[in-house]
Amino acid sequence: MKFLVAVDGSDASHRALDYARELAEAADASLTIVHSVDPTVYAESSPEPVSDLAEADRLYVAERVEESERRGAEILDGARGRVTDGGVDVSTSLLYGDPVVAVSDFAEENGFDAIIVGHHGVSARTEAAFGSVAKGLVSRARVPVTVVR
């Protein structure tokens, strides 16, 4: 079996990761940990992406993406360190795009048996404006999704 756990560095994603490790150990399954970097730029409190950016803004966005990639790599490294002591086969992957789309597509394309995700992530403001990743995964994913509180 193959389990996919989506993390964002929050306490909720740590709980999901701990649960996923226990589940993988019990099922003799592999565990892939993912984090999604979304390079899309949104206007404040709007679900619509900004399509027209000045060149200076494009450079700023590129810097923000690089910063997000570094942060994503740190989150994945920390998550891997949290689960490597249990004897589970663990891999990580940094994804790009909207987390709901990126994670659900990755799960389907790579034949995962289930997705495990925390109930609430790091950004309550973003969640209020756009909806939670967990809720989106439950709606969109074609494999079972376990939401950990």
Predicted region positions:
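Short secondary-structure boundary segments
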Residues: 35-36, 118-120, 149
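Absolute protein N-terminus
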Residues: 1-2, 149
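Structural beta-alpha unit
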Residues: 78-115
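A short acidic, glycine-rich active-site loop
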Residues: 53-74
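Small/aliphatic-rich secondary-structure junction motif
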Residues: 2-55
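Conserved beta-strand positions in the Rossmann-like core of class I SAM-dependent methyltransferases
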Residues: 32, 91, 146
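Short, hinge-like loop/turn segments at secondary-structure boundaries
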Residues: 48-52, 109-111, 133-135
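Glycine-rich, Arg-bearing micro-motifs that act as flexible, cationic patches
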Residues: 114-139
